[in-house]
Amino acid sequence: MIIERKRYIQQLLNSRHNGLLKIITGIRRCGKSFLLFNLFKRQLKLDGVDKEHIIEMAFDDFGNKVYRDPNKFYQYVKSLIKDGRMYYILLDEVQMLKDFEDVLNGLLHIPNADIYVTGSNAKFLSKDIITEFRGRGYQIHISPLSFSEFMSVYQGSQESGWVEYLQYGGLPPVILQPTDEDKIRVLKDLWQETYLIDILNRNRIKNNAELEELLCMLSSGIGGLVNPQKLSNTFKTNKNISIGSTTLKTYIDYCSDAFLIEEAKRYDVKGRKYISTPMKYYFTDLGLRNALINFRQIEKTHLMENAIYCELRRQGFNVDVGVVTVNGKDENGTSYRKQLEVDFVCNKGSRRCYIQSSLSLPSQDKIEQEINSLRRIDDGFERIVIVGESLISNRDANGILFMSIYDFMLNDL
């Protein structure tokens, strides 16, 4: 079964011949190697590139062990470049190549070499790899499957597919499992034996219980504001564990750096400035989030909000959490000041939109609640309410667009 990743293939095609090292990043098991060695290679051939001009090397293959020596590998590549036409060099698990940074920099000096790499050590599973090749690297970040990609292989209705996607996420080795029990087992194994170990080893964390407890707290509170000091107080009160807010923020940064979670900052829409704390965190994959807390607390409202955030990021938006400050007077003439929340403030180039997530709109009161912050924004940018049920897209008298979660998740904004 082949799951097409058209968005990423297009990004790879757009980056050809740009003189930079194409670095494919993303959490383990999200499909980086398959994208490069199957989908991208297939596209190159369809575009007329013959096999002699595609140089492949999977360094984790025992048969290629000899080429982990930097000199032998470099000479091997040089021996295959026989003319002035472009050669595409595809390298997997490149961290197993000794002195790989020096070798890759050397390959960049070959004028007719276009280089693409993936890796899965601590450096490649974090943002450090881009720092290593600053000015010479071009990152293509791969996420778990989108709902659209998931539905391309799911045998069932959109509604049942959506329920399963919220439950098990979009990691390819998970969704390809035949039963729910198998999906749960794979997710738990991946968390304990892969993702957790990566973060612990990379950052030399000795007390894995504290890290796991922190992630459980973040998992339980997706869509909620997170303040490290309040987390520290919770550890002390509920767990009788003394751990400082600075340490907790460092642990959160470790998880963010490993692409497991993402931070959304708060943005004052009217004041046009960022608010330092608190902020929100969303999980890169909902299946991993659910596995962390043993598939308890499966509230569709919060899962839907997380899924919308991830889809916006896939579509290339920078995403913040909006705050609209309202000043007024009550019926007694007493002045008040309150803050209304906009779930997402989304920016991409000159585009901006404001989005509210609502599982359902059963009454006019609920509709008024959801649009209360949006109708106070009058800067001319799109305002959208995404509803977690089927409906025909429509606009209200304020110009606010109402659309179903299916229309949003299956189409670009």
Question: How would you describe each model-predicted region?
Answer:
Residues 19-37:
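Walker A/P-loop nucleotide-binding motif
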Residues 114-120, 141:
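Structural recognition of the conserved hydrophobic beta-strand(s) that form the central parallel beta-sheet
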Residues 2-19:
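Pre-Walker A adenine-sensing motif
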Residues 2, 25, 34, 49, ...:
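A cross-kingdom feature that marks ATP-driven nucleic-acid transaction machinery
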Residues 82-100:
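Conserved P-loop NTPase "ATPase switch" module shared by AAA+ and STAND
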Residues 2, 148-325, 334:
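Interdomain hinge/linker elements that couple catalytic modules in large macromolecular machines
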Residues 106, 123-138, 153-155:
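Short regulatory helix/loop adjacent to the ATP-binding pocket of P-loop NTPases
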Residues 55-85:
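Short glycine-rich substrate-engagement loop in P-loop NTPases that contacts/grips substrate
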